[in-house]
Amino acid sequence: NESSVIVGKNQNTLSEINLDYIKENSIPVVRRQSGGGAVFHDLGNINFTFIASNNDNFSDFKRFTTPIIELLKTLDINAEFSGRNDLLINGCKFSGNAQYNYKNKVMHHGTLLFSSQISDMSNALKVKPIKFEGKSIKSVKARVTNISEHLKVPMDILEFKDLIIDYFYKTNTDNKYYTLSE
């Protein structure tokens, strides 16, 4: 999608965004049904979603993020799970994840920064001071990374998206493919 900011279900929108920058750049701000933190979307960001039956492991974020980590390993990128819902490369975040539960289903979704404009993200979102306690990191730019910066063989975002889809179908034959339309 074009640039937008998506805030979590329980967030105070004004405490998450740089309102002046948002207004100056006509960036839409929307609220999603799931929790989690505010995210900046642009054309360099890929979103993924898993919908599964809600069982004892529904809140296990590792269950849904492990396929992303394993895919990146095939590209010689060492990614890791961190905290409750983040994925990191070399200590820098490239993915945040959230979940929404309804009846007997869970929708797990995440962002993948592939070739996002980090400076735009940094300008659009406010960073909580607590994220910096005890750290010498001075900006969002120093704490996040794009997957494309770690690829041994360059590819564009469409090639990477196709790689994700192919990988999921090869590694899990139970996956169903849905094409959404208007």
State each model region's role.
Residues F81-A98, E182:
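Beta-rich nucleic-acid/ligand-interaction surfaces
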Residues I68, L75-D76, S95, K103-E182:
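Long, positively charged amphipathic alpha-helical accessory segments at protein N-termini or as interdomain linkers
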Residues N1-F58:
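N-terminal lobe of the biotin/lipoate ligase/transferase fold
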Residues N1, D42, G83, V106-H108, ...:
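A generic structural signal for well-ordered coil/turn residues at beta-strand boundaries
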Residues N18-L19, A38, N85, S95-K103:
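A generic local secondary-structure boundary/capping motif
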Residues N1-E2, D42-L43, I89-G91, Y102-K103, ...:
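Short acidic-glycine loop/turn motifs at beta-strand connectors
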Residues S15, N25-G35, R63-I68, L75, ...:
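Short acidic (Asp/Glu) patches
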Residues N45-N85:
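Contiguous, small/hydrophobic- and glycine-enriched helical/loop subdomains that border
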